[in-house]
Amino acid sequence: MELSEIRKNIDKVDTKLFELFEERMKLAECVARTKTSTGDCIYKPDREQQVISKFSEPADEDMKGYYEALIKRVMLISREYQYRILNEDTPADTEAAMLSADTVTVRFTYKGFPDNIVTAINDSGAKITGFTMNNSEYSISIRHDSCKTGIINLLKMIESESDNYSILVPEISVSDIPK
């Protein structure tokens, strides 16, 4: 087979991939809107692992690692898109809501998407009340009563153990937390 013919075939496959990707992103938008309306969180590590496991088992052993890398990247892009939609659906007074008396706002920068922080917050049982992002700067609002779970200390620990994060955590004391 000639190189030009191989390239034409690759172009056909790429066209199909683009169409499927667009379809997947439209479905991801539906997922984001559904999760937003039910108050569910976007990032579900168990679901992502289920998808990876489900489809990597029958894969050609030589391709398994490549497939896993591809699907992880697609899910990351999907998550970023869903968070953007969540951010668009947030009322215009997001900043005011994030600074309200019943929330603590954690601001941080990160190159890439902050799965560690989102997972840590979700795993702690803390309630995220707002999420905004602008390039690599993120703001997450957490209910004050979530601070009782030690989430602020957990976030500070993540920052101290990683060069990827710069976290601005407000200093709060127990007396600042509503009873």
Label every model-predicted segment:
Residues 1-179:
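Domain-level signature for soluble enzymes in the chorismate/prephenate branch of the shikimate pathway
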